């Protein structure tokens, strides 16, 4: 599936998940370029995923994911499958997480995507347009936060005897992502871990359209919108 790339600065983020890409549109993260349809009410009365018994069973092995799901649902977030090929998204504006309908038959992959999207949903991202460096670093830190959540959930699930849901992104970068997360476990510096993962992401994840590292890609967008201002 190819990602439709906009030249609008609001369309500013992409991450690979199971060979597909997630793009940011303002506060919304979505796979492919099709926006999902209207959201249905999320599950009530407990930290269920709303994505079926298979995903519930895998997600139940991660205390962190269970708590985050409960918190998000209490805060009014809805979680559901969208159309097949419609993409996966975390929309902060509408408090909606939608997973691509193609993931319904793969609970492990669905849980991986869910953990990543929950990471975005829980991270208080705001675009910082004060400078090129601030903007790029902010977008990549958001990816760092989502990746950290993915790793935390992955480890909790495997520690509880569940399947390895894997980590979103280029597999060549996973060692670096894990190293940054391990350092965070030692020193508790989440900001540094987000920055480290974001730096690797910015250099090591490549756009499918321009062949650029994402740090250069986002920086180019900033330059275009700001007229080259730093």
Regions found by a protein language model. Give the residues of each.
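Catalytic zinc-binding patch centered on the HExxH motif and its immediate surroundings
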Residues: 70-98, 103-108
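Active-site recognition of the HExxH zinc-binding catalytic motif
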Residues: 111-125
């Amino acid at each position: 599936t190819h990602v439709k790339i906009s030249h609008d600065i609001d369309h500013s983020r992409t991450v690979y998940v199971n060979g597909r890409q997630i793009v940011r549109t303002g506060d919304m993260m979505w796979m492919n370029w099709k926006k999902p349809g209207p959201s249905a009410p999320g599950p009530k009365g407990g930290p269920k995923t709303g994505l079926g018994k298979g995903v519930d069973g895998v997600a139940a092995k991660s205390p962190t994911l269970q708590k985050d799901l409960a918190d998000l649902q209490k805060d009014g977030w809805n979680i559901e499958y969208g159309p097949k090929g419609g993409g996966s998204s975390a929309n902060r504006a509408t408090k909606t997480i939608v997973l691509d309908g193609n993931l319904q038959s793969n609970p492990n992959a669905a849980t991986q995507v869910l953990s990543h999207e929950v990471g975005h949903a829980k991270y208080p991202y705001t675009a910082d347009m004060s400078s090129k460096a601030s903007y790029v670093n902010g977008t990549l830190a958001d990816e760092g936060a989502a990746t950290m959540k993915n790793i935390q959930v992955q480890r909790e699930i495997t520690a509880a005897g569940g399947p390895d849901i894997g980590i979103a992104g280029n597999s060549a970068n996973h060692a670096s992502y894990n190293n940054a997360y391990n350092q965070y476990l030692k020193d508790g510096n989440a900001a540094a871990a987000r920055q480290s993962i974001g730096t690797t992401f910015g250099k090591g994840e490549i756009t499918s359209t321009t062949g650029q590292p994402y740090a250069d890609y986002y920086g180019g967008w900033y330059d275009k919108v700001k007229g080259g201002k730093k």
